């Protein structure tokens, strides 16, 4: 995965360069569309989602359909797993069926197909429960009481205990932990991205977006860095948030290990014009 193009040699000795084949689950969503739009010159994408996707080979099926996933995973170098329940973060039945059941089906199909790497799209919701406890500086940031992390309050990162704020976050923690299992047991490289708030408008839409806002370009760059990360990364978790002054999750791990360089910032917008 460290090289962007795979070198193939024919029986005649001719050498050609081919783009890595990447299956995108949940390809019809916002992140999938951005990745396909911006990275198709670099990767050979195929899609998998319940809604059709134009412009790339596509399988229209439910993420829990493991037989369809098995067929779609054949011949793939990597899987970018975006599919999840996003309509109702606290609908446990749908989280169980889509976010948990679908993620397990994806890992199983990828492992059986010999996929070398899964980039699993996790979420900041795995940590946003830290905003809830009394006197939380993180909650105060989300409520517009501070314009930056107060002195003495630490930045949190992937090494801190998870504290989900919803069943959605619980489901994503299942995906992270299952990824670690498949990495340890089967040798698959699994990289998890704890995504910040990526919005269709590409700007914060409420005050609580300001700590965790992630510009679309920064999100796409993170996906690219994870798909192309060194083969030596067998399992890891990276926080993805733009350069927001109210940020309370530390993104230095991705900057140092992957060379990720976010350029967006919620500071370009005025929280006074938005609802809490």
How would you label these PLM feature ranges?
Residues 105-165:
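Conserved Rossmann-fold NAD(P)-dependent oxidoreductase catalytic core, especially the SDR/UDP-sugar
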Residues 184, 195-201, 213-235:
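Alpha-helical substrate-binding/gating segment
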Residues 64, 94-102, 170-171, 214:
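Glycine-rich NAD(P)-binding loop of the Rossmann-fold in SDR/ketoreductase-type enzymes
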Residues 22-38:
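N-terminal Rossmann NAD(P)H-binding glycine-rich loop of SDR-like oxidoreductase domains
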Residues 63-98:
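NAD(P)H-binding glycine-rich loop region in Rossmannoid oxidoreductase-like domains
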Residues 166, 176-201:
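Conserved beta-loop-beta element that borders a ligand/cofactor-binding pocket
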Residues 55-64:
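Rossmann-fold cofactor-recognition segment
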Residues 235-261, 276:
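Conserved C-terminal active-site "lid" loop/helix of NAD(P)H-dependent oxidoreductases
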